[in-house]
Amino acid sequence: MDESKRKALENALKAIEKEFGKGAVMRLGEMPKQQVDVIPTGSLALDLALGIGGIPRGRIVEIYGPESGGKTTLALTIIAQAQRRGGVAAFVDAEHALDPLYAQRLGVQVEDLLVSQPDTGEQALEIVELLARSGAVDVIVVDSVAALVPRAEIEGEMGDQHVGLQARLMSQALRKLTAVLAKSNTAAIFINQVREKVGVTYGNPETTPGGRALKFYASVRLDVRKSGQPIKVGNEAVGVKVRVKVVKNKLAPPFREAELEIYFGRGLDPVADLVNVAVAAGVIEKAGSWFSYGELRLGQGKEKAAEALRERPELLEEIRAKVLERSDQVVLAAGEDEGE
């Protein structure tokens, strides 16, 4: 950029800052990370992609994506992390599809989990607001926005038209909820589905139910969907690789991605996740299918390397500390193919 353009840009930025306040416009690479309380996601790769170490408390988070992509698994893992730190969690099951046994396998303390299965969208959102106002709940998950059916639709006939009711419901509720969550320092996670807009020829035809309010009020939006081939042991599929893209982030630079590995029946494997990130950070070396830490050979294949680290917790923590030291240089290439 030549000198005249640079000065013109500086003058424009100063005028904008004077009119609208500091931070109204900034360079993406210089965007400061805000210090907020967070709840870890259970995946180091995703915590680093979020830039703040987890999902923010006192804010709204939207997790959306196609069916069976790992959205509920991720939300339940966050609940387990909150409970592990002594927090209280609530699950508003609008879909009436919560599996307590699966939640337990993910580490959720189901006997302490607050669960509601509301009849209407209004009831669900009122429950969320009351729980947040109490100041005693650390994280609330709503599964899902698409299942928040307005009372008028429930009480009406099957063929009745109810245009915009759900969008209006979400807009009214979120206007109130945003301030309540900030005061109580409660994280609210809304799980959402995707729909396709009819007649879209150019651009992305996907949209999410519930209108635009959730997109606007959410501090973080995560796009969660399967990527690549299933994880196999021999010929048996034992899990799926899931790519999470931080589509919106008000607290750190957005558009980062993390690839997670979700295993059937047990969810995220934090040790395998750490191995992926440590390789990306250069803490663990990968030559062919062999994984090494310094002079120590961990094993052939990620499963063997992860197993070796599980048997040596002190080594696991040492590697984690080194990864965190290099977190600013980490290129999140978690879950890359092992060529096995």
Curated annotation (Swiss-Prot):
InterPro entries: AAA+_ATPase, DNA_recomb/repair_RecA, DNA_recomb/repair_RecA_CS, P-loop_NTPase, RecA-like_C, RecA-like_N, RecA_ATP-bd, RecA_C_sf. The gene is recA. This is Protein RecA. One of its GO terms (cellular component) is cytosol. The lineage of its organism: Bacteria, Thermotogati, Deinococcota, Deinococci, Thermales. NCBIfam families: tigrfam_recA (TIGR02012). It comes from Thermus thermophilus (strain ATCC 27634 / DSM 579 / HB8). Can catalyze the hydrolysis of ATP in the presence of single-stranded DNA, the ATP-dependent uptake of single-stranded DNA by duplex DNA, and the ATP-dependent hybridization of homologous single-stranded DNAs. It interacts with LexA causing its activation and leading to its autocatalytic cleavage. PANTHER family: MITOCHONDRIAL DNA REPAIR PROTEIN RECA HOMOLOG-RELATED, RECA. It is found in: Cytoplasm. CDD domains: RecA (cd00983). It comes from the Bacteria. Belongs to the RecA family. Pfam families: RecA, RecA_C. HAMAP family: RecA. Keywords: ATP-binding, Cytoplasm, DNA damage, DNA recombination, DNA repair, DNA-binding, Nucleotide-binding, SOS response. One of its GO terms (molecular function) is ATP hydrolysis activity. SMART domains: AAA. ATP binds at residues 65-72. One of its GO terms (biological process) is SOS response.
